[in-house]
Amino acid sequence: MKESTRTSTPSSGAKPKGDREICLRPSSSVFLGDQQLYFTQEYLATNSLNMKYVVYFAACQFSGPIAVIYAAPKSWFIWIRTISGRILKRDLPCTDPVFIDWTRAHCLLVLSKNGRAQVLSSIGEKVSEVFFDNQVSDVHECRTFATSRGDSGIAVMDVDGQVAVVNSVSEPVIWSMRPPYSELPTAWTAFQPHSQLTHILLIFEAVFLMGCQGESLQVQNHASVWVDSSTKYVKCVVDDARSRIAMMTENGKIQIVSIDLSTCFCTVEVTEHEIGKCINFGWVGNSVVFVQMSSSLTVFVNVSARRKPGDEVRFMSIKMTANARISVEPDGIRLFESTRVEFVEAASREKIAVLNRSLNEDGAYLYKAAQEMEQGTGHNSFAASTVIQDMYKAIDDCISTACDTWQPEEQKLLLKAARFGMAYTNTTPDTTKLMRAIKEIRVLNELRMVRTGIPLTHRQYRIIGDTCIINRLIDMGSYSVAIKVAQWLGGENCESVDRVLLEWVRRSISKVSRSNMKMDQPALEALDEKISAKLLQFPHVSMADAARRAIEAKLPELARLFIRRETDDESHVAVLLQLNDVSAALTKAAASQRPQLIHQVVRHLMTSESRSSYELAISRIPLAQCLYQDLVRQEGETRGISSRQMLALLEQASDFERQTLFHFDVAEIERNPSERLNALRRAKDAAKSMGDKAIEEILNDVSAFAPLQIQRGQADMSVRDTIIEIADDTAKVAQLKQQARLNDKQVLLWTIEGLAKKGKMEQLFDLAQKRSPIGYAPFVKACVRYKRNEEVNKYFAKANGYSDLVAANLAKKNYVDAAKLAYDRRDREVLHAIHMKSHDDPVQCPRVKQLLNSMDQA
């Protein structure tokens, strides 16, 4: 067994930064076998953390805020701070707390002794509550666990050993599980494997019981192949990937096993320290565990799966100041001491290769070449670059290492190395990865500043993503940083900027509305000026959204001040309707000359006001009145009381054009011939009053023709249907032609169709014997339509001329023949139309398509 010591990592010679800045000194490192741990001092002079008097401590994963609970006489108080010490909430009272922890949704969970859990935001606002008090007696211990949905669950064990579980804190549904033994377990945990139910693992000395929701606890007999039954297990911790569990026995043995307890990957025994009596135990990345012996001593142990039985155990111990606390991150741990915050992480392969100048590592040679270039020794730089075998891998290693380092000077040099290597590639380099890395490093460095206090690592950043980072900044009230980050990541007009600004507006308005401040007109105008001045810097952000936030906060006068600045008419009208200021909305919609806005207001009126009220309001605006009439007509309200009211409105407004259309609609849907005729006559009178001679003449003809249709008993038939019906009576056809003022071509087409329909083939043939002014394609089409197949070829043979032949072939669905005619004429438009019609024939369509392609290629 060998203990390692820390060494300082060579830096680029940069001077230390001022107090309370990120990364005061270069990172130090230590090798634990095949693992290298990096120790980075994130912040110094963090006396405001005041760790000495802390009773309960919890740090949010992914470098989020920390929460501490202090005890005062007869009371408890919660303080929430960033890691750099900036206070987010102070002196928040709580009752009999026994446990605090952060969820992955950036919320603080405070569990009281009686089993009541409060869920708070990162600035101490109450979000929800979870009541375990009906399920458990006094709380003994508690565990939180990550879920597959990205949220957190909680498991609470009472003094009787019963476990109550909530799979998701945001949607609390409690279920419980009771072990078969009366004593409490020596170790236990809760976890949710990927795409599986929540599992509870209880260990009674060397007996392992596991169960999930809906099942009872079962003894895990298959674990006997690796369980040490001569001792008892005192700790068990699930890794961040939820695939392995680290077990610890009271005699100092650490075992790494699979999540289903079927396989033991690694066993390590530490004899230099009595680790079985530790106060904290957990993972550092994937291959190292830490054991906190006391508030001032922590041991790190290599538990890599690559260790072989009999290999020397590698560990190291570090001493810390008194009252130190540890928080676990997905890629490392964070040490909170009295005067500093330090991050411990297991280095990636790329970082080890580049920064340790490993032999035969292309990334290390490229980094050395960049350093030589920076120092002005170009010949040495060229010499270092010539030994690189895989330049693309070297570039990727330097970019990855730049993202993983903390010192800005070192980041710049590594990025320069990557850019330098691109000059030696055989193809045009793809700079996408480099540009993305520069953008992400810029964001990370901004987040790590003391004023923000989120020392996020690149690996953590990649896990939670851009949106989650911006959400966390919003939760903490860091709006200026959130806007800056959103602009860097998505550009000036990205949706994230809008979201940040509107959340700032909401919180600013809510803060004022909850206060005892008198909200008179000057105060509202001052708040309007403050918020508008900021929003107007971002033209893509709608003032209407700010007005909606004011409405939600029950400050309608403030909303009216906001909406005056809104330039989009649609948003302006929508907010006025929310304010129930209908007259202003109607005036604004009419002034915009946009019918859809007026429709929107009219519909709102029809659903919220009485008919007399909204018709009176609409009658004052002519355009609104016209659109209202359209709306009623479209909805079919043209009968009964609504019809008479509509007509009265039109007559009152002397709107003869709308009156004409109104009577047309009545005539169209009226089934009574007499009423239909009356409607047509009223339409004619309205057209006459309107002074439109053309419409008046048309209506005069229609109203004169309608009585004759009634006399013939054909009131429900159109002119076309009538001629088809009497096609074999030439006298009646001639009479109807004169009455309806039809042209010869139209009458001929309908007569052909009528004779074919009635089977009057002799009359049809006599008609065809005369020279047809419309060709013979209509004869073919009529015979095909009414299945007079024996007559089709007779008329098809008479067809002549290009258009007549094409139409006749189309009537017979001879698409290929029609296409050939069009192809010979080089008539692409007709050929394309034939191709579109041929799609219903899968045999002919490809051949027509071939002719079309041939014409396009010619």
Curated annotation (Swiss-Prot):
Region annotation Disordered: where it falls in the sequence: 1-20
Tell me the keywords, alphabetical order: Endosome, Lysosome, Membrane, Protein transport, Transport
Task: Tell me the membrane topology, using the record's own terms.
Answer: Peripheral membrane protein
Q: Which GO terms describe its biological process?
A: endosomal transport; intracellular protein transport; vacuole fusion, non-autophagic
- Does this UniProt record's set of keywords contain Membrane? yes
* Any GO molecular function: actin binding
Record's GO cellular component terms = endosome; HOPS complex; late endosome membrane; lysosomal membrane
Localisation per UniProt entry: Late endosome membrane; Lysosome membrane
Q: Which residues form a coiled coil?
A: none
Query: What start and end residues bound the annotated signal peptide?
Result: none
Pfam families, alphabetically?
Vps16_C, Vps16_N
Comp. bias intervals (Polar residues): 1-12
Q: What is its main location?
A: membrane
Q: What does this protein do?
A: Plays a role in vesicle-mediated protein trafficking to lysosomal compartments including the endocytic membrane transport pathways. Believed to act as a core component of the putative HOPS and CORVET endosomal tethering complexes which are proposed to be involved in the rab-5-to-rab-7 endosome conversion probably implicating sand-1, and via binding SNAREs and SNARE complexes to mediate tethering and docking events during SNARE-mediated membrane fusion.
Subunit annotation: Probable core component of at least two putative endosomal tethering complexes, the homotypic fusion and vacuole protein sorting (HOPS) complex and the class C core vacuole/endosome tethering (CORVET) complex. Their common core is composed of the class C Vps proteins vps-11, vps-16 and vps-18, which in HOPS further associates with vps-33.1, vps-39 and vps-41 and in CORVET with vps-8 and vps-33.2.
UniProt family annotation: Belongs to the VPS16 family.
Name assigned to this protein: Vacuolar protein sorting-associated protein 16 homolog
Provide the gene name from the record. Answer: vps-16
